[in-house]
């Protein structure tokens, strides 16, 4: 087996969210599926962050699954970021997470199992911080490490936040600065400073559970989680599904330090 200190990012051709199938390709496939639905269920048709299943007149269960390849080299940190990302979909719908299941792909013949332990402990650390249990999961052998979670949550039926219900003249609110994709690409190429890396890692492993605070301060009509398709991709998806257009002023966008300079270098 390889040394425990090996760089995890060298095992993936695309960093994390960049490995996602494109929205166009995904839509092409999903449009050909004739799925079963009833009045209590809502699935991928609206491209919301979670599926919804109404359990009574007051509440619904919401569920999401998310996993990706390493975007940082430290296994514990990778686990933290992957868990925070999985939980983010629940928060984007306005829900409360109840429990999680781990999803693991790991090259057991190439990497020490202690690395997998560290990844899982990273995910556990995030879940412990909000007092939700990890009740199980599923694992397979794979040449490329992958980790994420299936998260189940609950939400009041009259408080569900969807991504296709934006209204004209709505303001756009971001809970975090953007640019993590560019930073992680630069990290894989070892061309960013330790300060930039630490700042971005802190942002990525921070939970988006401030949504409830924002809801109490503003009337939120629609919400989504910005990940693999970036700000423009997700705003476009939200605007089109709401039959609107969006106007974004570059100077008003919170951006991680150093991202603009890296973008100018085609990173």
What is the predicted role of each segment?
Residues 1-267:
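Helix-biased detector of long, well-ordered alpha-helical tracts
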């Amino acid at each position: 087996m390889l040394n425990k200190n090996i760089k995890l990012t060298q095992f993936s051709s695309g960093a994390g969210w960049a490995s996602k199938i494109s929205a166009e390709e995904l839509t092409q496939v999903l449009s050909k599926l004739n799925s079963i639905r009833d009045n209590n269920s809502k699935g991928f048709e609206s491209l919301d962050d979670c599926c919804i299943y109404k359990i009574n007149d007051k509440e619904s269960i919401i569920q999401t699954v998310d996993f990706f390849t390493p975007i940082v080299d430290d296994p514990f940190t990778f686990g933290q970021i992957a868990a925070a990302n999985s939980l983010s979909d629940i928060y984007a719908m306005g829900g409360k997470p109840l429990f999680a299941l781990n999803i693991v792909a790991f090259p057991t013949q190439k990497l020490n199992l202690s690395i997998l332990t560290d990844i899982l402990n990273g995910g556990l650390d995030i879940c412990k911080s909000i007092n939700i249990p990890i009740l199980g999961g599923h694992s397979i052998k794979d040449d490329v490490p992958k980790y994420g979670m299936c998260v189940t949550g609950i939400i009041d039926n009259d408080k569900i936040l969807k991504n296709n219900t934006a209204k004209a003249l709505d303001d756009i609110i971001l809970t975090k600065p953007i640019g993590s994709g560019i930073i992680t690409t630069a990290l894989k190429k070892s061309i960013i400073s330790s300060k930039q890396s630490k700042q971005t890692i802190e942002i990525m492993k921070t939970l988006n559970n401030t949504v409830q605070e924002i809801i109490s301060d503003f009337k939120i009509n629609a919400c989504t989680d910005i990940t693999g398709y970036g700000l423009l991709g997700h705003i476009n998806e939200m605007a089109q599904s709401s039959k609107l257009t969006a106007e974004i002023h570059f100077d008003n966008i919170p951006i991680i330090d150093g991202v603009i300079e890296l973008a100018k270098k085609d990173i």
